[in-house]
Amino acid sequence: MPEYLILVTPAANRVFGGQAAGLTAAELEICAGPGRAAVSGVVSMAGVDYIAFQASDYAAIAETVAGLSSAHAVFERVDELLRPVELVNTDRFADDLVTIPKYQGKTNEQFTRLLVNVTAASMSRRPPGPISLLDPLAGRGTTLSVGLTLGYDVAGVESDVKAVEAYAAFLKTYLRRKRLKHKASIDPVRREGRSLGRRLQVEVTPEAGGRPQQLTVFTGDTRQSAALFGKRRFDLVVADAPYGVVHGSSAAGRRDRSPAALLTDALPVWAGQLKHGGALGLSWNTYGLTREELTGIATGAGLEPVADGPYLRLGHRVDSAIHRDVFVARRP
């Protein structure tokens, strides 16, 4: 069976870069699906690390490999030589949509794409049309921009009005400079005479053409996400939970550095916004909440956790205060 080697994209963050190959190996195993890629793991050739795998039908997984979060180049191994294999880029937008914004607390872009990829691969039912993604902790839109890049329709909720305004300003400038056909507005939202905050609405057609994609972000409390979106349901819910360092949640009128209080209240709301067969993907700091505790919250919300094999190899160190892991669950 032919053997292939993936060269991992260099990472500006040294700590993440040192762990990226192992994370991408697990990502490939999840995203390729059972029996389509026999992943050997990380191997070294001439002092350079690669992800090694075998595939009898590479063409069947070519788009999956090209879409991995850290795939920089792919080679077919021929004895001691490496033959380059073309990476077919299927992204709908250039990667600078995700990489240009720089701000304190921004989650690593490569990891964000891994989180979205793994969650999407875990759906038990593929939608007949475009995939829809909700980030109920949207921040300044990294996950939403990754979703747009992958061709999804995206939506979010964010309590920080200034973060939404900053994301709106970036999008308007970016789309204008790229000369992409689009409509963008940020407007107040009122229902039954009450102000519910503001809504960012964007419709954009990628440079390559095709169908327009939709982005909607509400300002407000993520616990009210279902009320904000009404009957709308999503194929994916993807969120970067508070790490308890820069982020936090509010409980009983005080700042809570653990994500437990927020997730206990909000996760059942998010679960109800998933379509049947859809998947939820969370990244969180295991120093503030154990996997067992998070599993209990998810099962109590009617979700079915996916916690075996490569799903248990996605944990990694961020810094001395943060050990980040990935939790995935499906709505039956």
Predicted regions span which residues?
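Class I S-adenosyl-L-methionine-dependent methyltransferase catalytic core
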Residues: 1-27, 77-134, 138-332
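N-terminal auxiliary segments of SAM/dcSAM-dependent transferases
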Residues: 2-82
